[in-house]
Each structure stands twice: as structure tokens, then as C-alpha cells.
Amino acid sequence: MSIQYTTVGDLKVGNYVVIDGEPCRVVEISKAKTGKHGSAKANIVAIGLFTGQKRTLMAPVDQQVEVPIIEKHIGQILADKGDTITIMDMENYETFDIEKPTDADIVDKIRPGAEVEYWEIMGRKKIVRVK
């Protein structure tokens, strides 16, 4: 798995974090200083990149969290198989199947021969946009 570590206090809106084994994009952060002897806590709300599910993380700001390393690639659509799409990577010409995205803007532009940008995150692949 391609991950690195950072502290909860260093996270900002728009960053990526792993919550419950799922890579997520941070959409909201609120920090609260507790009492005289307590350390500050952060409440992080994030949306899963693959599931779209809302996830929350409540942790001290000095706690280490996993941050996924996102590898961005360009590929060409070879075939639309209904639920999956066959893509060929433009750098190493490897072919593989990716689950069809649910975003209507992307689905409308999918056609054989079109170039797509896809992300590889923690061993999983996702189409982000069609060029």
C-alpha cells in the first residue's frame, strides 16, 4: 500500500486521509481545545473517494494518520463493457478494467478512443476525468 504519515493537526480541507481503511478527501475540519490539562482535539469530516460515503475522525491533533499517495496516470478507453471499462495506460501500454464511474458528466463523455485521467490509490483505480 502506498501511504505516508502526517499529524491530524497538519491536515487541511482538500487534503486526503485514510479513515477505516478507505481513502477520503477532507471536506471539513474543526479543532477544539479541551480543558486545562487536555490536548486539543480535531473533528475531521471526509468523503470516501471510491464509495462517496461520509466518514468522520475524532482524534488529538498530535496523532499520526495515514495519507494515501495518489498516482495520476493517462489512459485510453478501449472498450465499454457496461459496468466496467477497459483502459490502456499511455505510458506502459498495460490494459486493465476499471469500474465505471457514477458521475454523470464523466459517463456522458466515455467512448472508445477517448483519453482519461485515472488515479491509482492504495492498489485501486478510479477514473477522474475524460479529456
Curated annotation (Swiss-Prot):
Per the record, the GO terms for biological process are: positive regulation of translational elongation; positive regulation of translational termination
Q: Which UniProt keywords apply?
A: Cytoplasm, Hypusine, Initiation factor, Protein biosynthesis
| MF GO annotations | ribosome binding; RNA binding; translation elongation factor activity; translation initiation factor activity
Q: At what positions is Hypusine found?
A: K36
Give coiled-coil spans as residue ranges: none
The answer on whether this UniProt entry bears the keyword GTP-binding reads no
| InterPro entries (alphabetical) | IF5A-like, IF5A-like_N, NA-bd_OB-fold, Rib_uL2_dom2, Trans_elong_IF5A_hypusine_site, Transl_elong_IF5A_arc, Transl_elong_IF5A_C, Translation_prot_SH3-like_sf
What function is annotated for this protein? Answer: Functions by promoting the formation of the first peptide bond.
- HAMAP family for the chain: eIF_5A (MF_00085)
Q: Which family does it belong to?
A: Belongs to the eIF-5A family.
Q: What is this protein called?
A: Translation initiation factor 5A
Organism of derivation: Sulfurisphaera tokodaii (strain DSM 16993 / JCM 10545 / NBRC 100140 / 7) (Sulfolobus tokodaii)
